[in-house]
Amino acid sequence: MRLSAAPIGAAFLSITMTTQIAQSQVLDLVLPTDNDALFSGDGPAFYQYVERNYKGAKSTPWEGGQYGFVRDPTDTAGGIVYTRFHEGVDIRPLHRDPRGEPLDEVRAIADGKVVHTNLVPGYSNYGKYVVIEHQWGGSSYYSLYGHLSSIAVQPGDVAKRGQRIAVMGYTGTGLNQERAHLHLELDLMFSRQFEAWHNAFFRNDPNHNGIYNGLNLAGLDVARLYLALHKNPSLTIPEFLSGEEIFYRVTLPKSHHFDLPRLYPWILGAGKRNEKSSWEVSFARSGVPLKIEPSDKRVTQPELTYVKNSSIDYSYLTRDIVSGRGANAQLSGYGRQLMRLLTYPD
């Protein structure tokens, strides 16, 4: 019996497309500098220290260069709480010239496209920085490289994994030559309407960096992601974030401008939605959005609908997005503004 070539071609096309989709999910990250002490567990060799003055005692803890709530210790009834969030990791230099200037090459952590370069240190706390867009699983993620001394790429350039894009430096607020480092983030984006939102709420604070302003980017735990990928190279970002604890939930009014589920369709829960439904967004303590589900609760403005129980002031635990204690918890003024960003201009 003679077989038609069409089914074979269709099957081949199906296999090829499936393979391409699977490959598009693969992160295949490389570290951005020669410093690979992260993988040997040598924190002091990998992370740049911070200068701390706590109750008159000065110290230089390397832990302050990690991701998360690692800075500004504060005494509370529940003990010492680190209240300042660090959205990325600070990587120490390995190479310096005789004057002490850092020489480390900074490289793209994965294939992508350069979408932003800030060449004026005073325009951002990041100093000179680069943002590269990566496409994984049909969604855009953004690697950010901060405190650079020089930049070798420009917006629109294709960046290949491991390609030199800059040189490490110490541009930005509060840094000096000794504490030179690369600040690395891997981010989700909140909204493509950020510039209009910023103009409405921060009129006296010029935005020089468009939608790539740090306020519009939610950084995940990139060091933990690197370590997780060493154990499971096929791990995807949705799978990685599925292990994060939900710390608070916010219900948003119905809006046609809600950009987050368009940017990250995987974040949508399976609940059935009708035309009158609001949206409930679940967040990690870091502020990274984890899940979006329809809600029957009718709201006219963003409303806190859940927060993990704690006796500590929530402003210390949530980057000042939630304020108050216990049953008195609510969105702070800044928290309400940030939630407005998600559905702006509604």
Q: In which residue ranges do the predicted regions lie?
A:
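Surface-exposed, glycine-biased beta-strand/turn segments
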Residues: 24-128, 170, 207-346
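Membrane-interface motif at the C-terminal end of an N-terminal transmembrane signal
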Residues: 19-23
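Surface-exposed strand-loop junctions at beta-sheet edges and helix termini
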Residues: 109, 153-154, 159
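Conserved, short, structured surface segments that act as functional micro-motifs
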Residues: 123-133, 147, 157-233
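Bacterial N-terminal signal peptides that target proteins for export
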Residues: 1-8
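Zn2+-dependent peptidoglycan hydrolase active-site motif and core
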Residues: 101-103, 107-150, 177-179, 183
